[in-house]
């Protein structure tokens, strides 16, 4: 059983404040939610289990039980998860406030310990001090956290997470902030707490404390498309699709890292809860992560043979050709922007190949086919440029004054002509590697200009950012039919 979950369940009964703060969905009546196979730690109850997506940020970080409350670490309501979440620069005073909050919500003294032990011993089979019956008393105060970086902002969700070596498929990584505080001070806090426990439980408490307070922080993970709800990924092919999210809000006037101080003033905390409400937002999916997801899907469906073919139709309109026909049944082609990019890039590449007749040899064709498969994945800049360079070298360019040139005198479609005029200023007859890179980038940037895209989607924004963008009518940034250039 999760130690943090058990502690919340038992300590919830000791006073009115705890009853309000320590209420977890996992300790209440179970309500079904979409089951998934994503493994990790629920940020709400800290247990390692199967996770489902959060309605506040669409990432997988909540268990099927806790999802009924819809709590997100990005909320603006002072629930327990939000008060345990710290952001960016954390000071020693911030950590002291966190420790004080733990001490307030999970007090350890002779009266509390005796009360829990007496309640447990009412059952005949629980006369001995076995750890499974006193799990709630064995939660030490640590500075163990799960951290994540979202567009430059780093969030730390503190808690007590068991089984740190278990499978973690979430974008959160374990971070230990004890060095930012003081090991001896934290040791003293826990030794005092431990002194109230029966001797038979003290050893287990000490083992848990040192294992969770002396570990080495993990390397921070990169957020990718697999960390977001499958429901969102399945609808990315619709250019006008907007993600519906809900956030728990209140009139929280304190700084982000000061929310945990609210438990020191009970009346102020309950006054704050009276202002609680749910806010709904409909936000755009435009970001580098989701753009890369779409371009990668299209890359898997590439038919490189088209660049040496004589088809009169665009690349996605070829039918009944074993080597060049694209499988249009995939939903990625429902996004007309991806289709446009694919058609224009392959129109340009075919013109390059046809203009350089030496490419006609079969061995050269087979080489260029391998390199063409990565020409859409512009989000991975190094890999993409390497792919373009290898395609260029397959054209057997001529070198003059240390600059390599290839011919360009084959027909192209009107869309590519417009791109050439906009990016180079004319329709050239010879091209350098730099020209080729610029042209292909321009074809992609016309619809997905990743230079000006944030990395993660708007669903990972804080409430104040969402409100500001909503006021400026920027949460839904563009409708279908409008490109980034327009």
From Swiss-Prot:
Motif (pLxIS motif) on chain: 480-483
The scientific name of the source species is Rotavirus A (strain RVA/Human/United States/Wa/1974/G1P1A[8]) (RV-A)
The UniProt record lists the keyword Translocase: no
**Which ranges belong to the motif IKBKB-like degron (ILD) motif?**
479-483
Keyword line = Host cytoplasm, Host cytoskeleton, Host-virus interaction, Inhibition of host innate immune response by virus, Inhibition of host IRF3 by virus, Inhibition of host IRF7 by virus, Inhibition of host NF-kappa-B by virus, Inhibition of host RLR pathway by virus, Interferon antiviral system evasion, Metal-binding, Phosphoprotein, RNA-binding, Viral immunoevasion
Query: Which Gene Ontology molecular function entries are recorded, alphabetically?
Result: metal ion binding; RNA binding
InterPro entries in the cross-refs: Rotavirus_NSP1 (IPR002148)
Single GO BP term: symbiont-mediated suppression of host cytoplasmic pattern recognition receptor signaling pathway via inhibition of IRF3 activity
Name of the protein this chain belongs to: Non-structural protein 1
Q: Where in the cell is it found?
A: Host cytoplasm, Host cytoskeleton
> Could you give the subunit structure recorded for this chain?
Interacts (via C-terminus) with host IRF3; this interaction leads to IRF3 degradation. Interacts with host IRF7; this interaction leads to IRF7 degradation. Interacts with host CUL1 and CUL3. Interacts with host BTRC.
Q: How is it modified after translation?
A: The C-terminal region is phosphorylated by host CKII/CSNK2A1. Phosphorylation of the DSGXS motif is essential for host NF-kappa-B inhibition.
The record's function comment reads: Plays a role in the inhibition of host innate immunity by inducing the degradation of key host factors required to activate interferon production such as IRF3, IRF5 or IRF7. Associates with components of cullin RING ligases (CRLs) including CUL1 or CUL3, which are essential multisubunit ubiquitination complexes, to modulate their activities. Recognizes the host NF-kappa-B regulator BTRC through the presence of a DSGXS motif in the C-terminal substrate recognition domain.
**GO terms for CC?**
host cell cytoplasm; host cytoskeleton
Query: What is the residue range of the signal peptide feature?
Result: none
Outline the segment boundaries, as ranges, of region: Important for cytoskeleton localization: 82-176
Instruction: Provide the family line.
Output: Belongs to the rotavirus NSP1 family.
Copy the domain comment. The integrity of the zinc-binding domain in NSP1 is important for degradation of host IRF3.
> Which region ranges are annotated with the description Interaction with host IRF3?
317-486
């Amino acid at each position: 059983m999760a130690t943090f979950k058990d502690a919340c369940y038992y300590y919830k009964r000791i006073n009115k404040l705890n009853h309000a703060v320590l209420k977890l969905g996992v300790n209440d009546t179970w309500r079904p939610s979409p089951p998934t196979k994503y493994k990790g730690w629920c940020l709400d109850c800290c247990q390692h289990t199967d996770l489902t997506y959060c309605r506040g940020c669409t990432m997988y970080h909540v268990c099927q039980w806790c999802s009924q409350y819809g709590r997100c670490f990005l909320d603006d309501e002072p629930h327990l998860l939000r008060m345990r979440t710290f952001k960016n620069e954390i000071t020693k005073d911030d950590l002291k406030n966190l420790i004080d909050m733990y001490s307030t919500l999970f007090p350890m003294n002779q009266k509390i310990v005796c009360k829990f032990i007496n309640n447990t011993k009412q059952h005949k089979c629980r006369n001995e001090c076995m750890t499974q019956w006193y799990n709630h008393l064995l939660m030490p105060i640590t500075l163990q956290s799960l951290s994540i970086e979202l567009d430059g902002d780093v969030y730390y969700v503190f808690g007590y997470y068991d089984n740190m070596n278990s499978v973690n498929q979430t974008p959160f990584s374990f971070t230990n902030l004890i060095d930012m505080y003081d090991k001896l001070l934290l040791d003293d806090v826990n030794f005092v707490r431990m002194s109230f426990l029966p001797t038979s439980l003290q050893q287990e408490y000490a083992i848990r404390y040192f294992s969770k307070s002396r570990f080495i922080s993990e390397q921070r993970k990169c957020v990718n498309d697999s960390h977001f709800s499958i429901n969102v990924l399945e609808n990315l092919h619709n250019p006008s699709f907007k993600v519906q999210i809900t956030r728990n809000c209140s009139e929280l006037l304190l700084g982000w890292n000061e929310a945990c101080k609210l438990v020191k003033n009970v009346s102020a905390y309950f006054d704050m809860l009276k202002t609680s409400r749910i806010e709904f937002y409909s936000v755009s999916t435009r970001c580098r992560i989701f753009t890369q997801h779409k371009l990668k899907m299209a890359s898997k469906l590439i038919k490189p043979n088209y660049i040496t073919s004589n088809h009169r139709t665009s690349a996605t309109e070829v039918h009944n050709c074993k080597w060049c026909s694209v499988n249009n049944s995939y939903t990625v082609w429902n996004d007309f922007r991806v289709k446009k990019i694919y058609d224009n890039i392959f129109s340009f590449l075919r013109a390059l190949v046809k203009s350089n007749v030496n490419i006609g040899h079969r061995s050269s064709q087979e080489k260029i086919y391998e390199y063409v498969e990565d020409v859409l994945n512009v989000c991975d800049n190094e890999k993409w440029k390497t792919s373009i360079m290898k395609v260029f070298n397959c054209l057997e360019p001529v070198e003059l004054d240390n600059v390599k040139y290839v011919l360009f005198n084959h027909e192209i479609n009107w869309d590519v002509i417009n791109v050439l005029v906009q990016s180079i200023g004319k329709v050239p007859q010879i091209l350098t590697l730099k020209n080729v890179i610029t042209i292909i980038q321009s074809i992609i940037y016309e619809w997905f200009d990743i230079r000006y895209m944030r990395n993660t989607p708007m669903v990972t924004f804080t409430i104040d950012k969402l409100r500001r963008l909503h006021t400026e009518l920027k949460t839904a940034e563009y409708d279908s039919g409008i490109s980034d250039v327009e």
